[in-house]
Structures are given as structure tokens and as C-alpha cells.
Amino acid sequence: YVDANMSQAILLSCLLFEKANALKSLADYDNTGILGIKRFRMRLRKEVFADERGAKFSYFALFERKRQTINGIMGKELFEILSNVSSISWYDEKIHAYYFDFWVNEATKQAFRSYFHTAIECFQVFRLLYELNNYAVTMEKQKEIFESRGVYTEGKFGIPGADNDIFHFLDFFLVKQMNRQGKQEDLLLRQFSDGEHQFIHMMAICLLLKDADSLLILDEPETHFNPSWRSRFVSILNETLKNACEGNEHNFKKDILITTHSPFIISDCKPENVIILRKDKEGQTLAKKASQESIMTYGASTSFIQAKIFGNKDAIGGKAYQEMKKMSEQTDMDKQQLLNDVSTLFGESLEKLMILGKINNRE
């Protein structure tokens, strides 16, 4: 399970390890325009915890306990590795924290690759570091969370803020193309829009798991996308995986499960691959393939899919349509004036043409 809190770690792993061809979808100006990572900082606090026997140990020892869970990545002391691959590192006595600064160039990437070998291995290290932030949760709170059966369990889980995190990324600067003339700027990742964050998150996950025997489950990936990205999402996803698997084509066929309400995404899927979920009169959820209902989704218009799958036949907003319909029913107004008012007030649509026709045919 990978959530939005790990977006920086996922993206960083991809930008450090993937070849330029695999990163084309991110670099494309029409997508995010991310050309690479410029620099970033990592901070690790030297906290002390108590184990179940009451003995004290630092999180250095915690890594030793979990060493086997990350396939031997931690073959060397982590802090020695980070010192070796960073541009500069130091220890802050006041807050008991280590800082590692990285000015990223090709040598930086080669250094990461020599220690961590693959993007997924590098990410596993970052993921484990993120886990340490949870150790601030008391045993009493852990027990309450584990035994909770309510719908507000997530709200019980308080994560420390940036100042108290054991592991934290700082000054995460990306190189972004700002216009079609090639202008570039260094931007913090937090300066990107919600849609860009979601796009980066989805594509980076797919790149990260491209060589893994995995089922990718994407829950409404288009939520914050603009219309252009929604209409091109499947094409972009397909192109991203194809480029990433170049020279290793047997990995290209990935099983991806997408939940969506977007007619654009459905229009790019064959009917035998589209499963429609509906509730019957008793409230039971029924599942049928679009092909079983003779709904040809592939290449279908969004209005057709809206009507056939989502039961929404409206092609324009409900408020505008009701106002348009109300105007067409006015009988005490000059016909030509009414035609002019409808033409001026409303944008172009099939509904508008039908209303104009209805008014024009009035006796």
C-alpha cells in the first residue's frame, strides 16, 4: 500500500534510477514538464525508544532488526551510505539530527545505483525510514487503533509534524519546463498543483513496479486531472510502461485495475475489460461486463458512456438546461426576441439547438 505521503520518495527513486526514455511522460510539457531533480535534503533525528523489555535502543538498532525485510539492502550502515552518496552531511547537536544534502548530477545517480541497485530497493529504504515516524505513537494509542472497529480510526492516528518527524525530506527542488519555448525553473514539489501531484504519484508508482510481478490497483486516478489528462490517461499510462520496459518487453503486459467514474477512461477500454457495478432493488451490488450488456465502450463518445453506463443523459448542466427549457415555454414573448435571448445567453450544445428549433416551430 502506497499513499500520497510517500510521493516524494516514489518520485525521487524514479528520477534517480530510471532512464530518460522511461521518464518521457513526466518530462512532456503537456503533462508535468518535470525534467529532473535539482537538489534535496534529508533529515534523520537520533531518537531513542524502549522495546518490550524496557531496554533502550536507537533506531540504528531498529534497522538491524528489520534488515531481512528489505532483502539485504542495509548491507552497510545506513548513515555511512548516506554520507557517501550525499554532497555534504552534518550533525546538529541542538536537535540531535543528521542532515544530508544532495546536489543531484550524474555522479549522484551513479552513487545511489551502486548502493541500492534498483529504484524499488531505494524506495524500500525510504519507506522504512518513513515508518519510523510512527514510533512516536504511544503503546496505549496503538492498542486503541488496533482494537478500533469504527469508521473514524484514521482520525485517531496522530502523526508528528515536520519538526518532530524522525525522517523528513526538505528543500525538494525539481527542474520544470515552464513554457513551450523551453524556459526552466527550479520549483519545490509542494508548489505543484493537486492534479500534478496525482499525475506524478500514479506514473511514478507504475514505473517503480514495472519489473515486479504485481497487480496495480488505481482508485479513481483521474480525480484532480484536467480534461486533457483525463482523455489521455490510458494512452499516457500505456506509453509510460512501454517506454520503461523497452528491451524487456515480456514485462510490458501489466495487470492494472482502475476504479473510475470518468467516461474518458472507459472510452479507452475494450468492453470485455469494463466491469459495471450496479445495485439492485434489494441494495445488492451486481457486476457485469460491458460486453454482456452489449455496450461498445471502446472509442465511444463520453455522452454515450454517460447515458449507457452512468444513467446520465444530460450533456449540459442541470441549472442551465432548466432555465433554457423554461424560456422555451414562454408564450407571452416575441418569438424573435426569445430566439435572440436563447442564442445570446447559452453556449453551443445539441440541447440549445433543439430548444431553438422548438421555439422557431411555434405557431
PLM features: residue spans?
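C-terminal alpha-helical "lid" subdomain
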Residues: 308, 312-363
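Extended helical coiled-coil dimerization/tether regions that scaffold
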Residues: 7-200, 204-215, 245-248, 360-361
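Switch/communication elements of ASCE P-loop NTPase nucleotide-binding domains
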Residues: 161-315
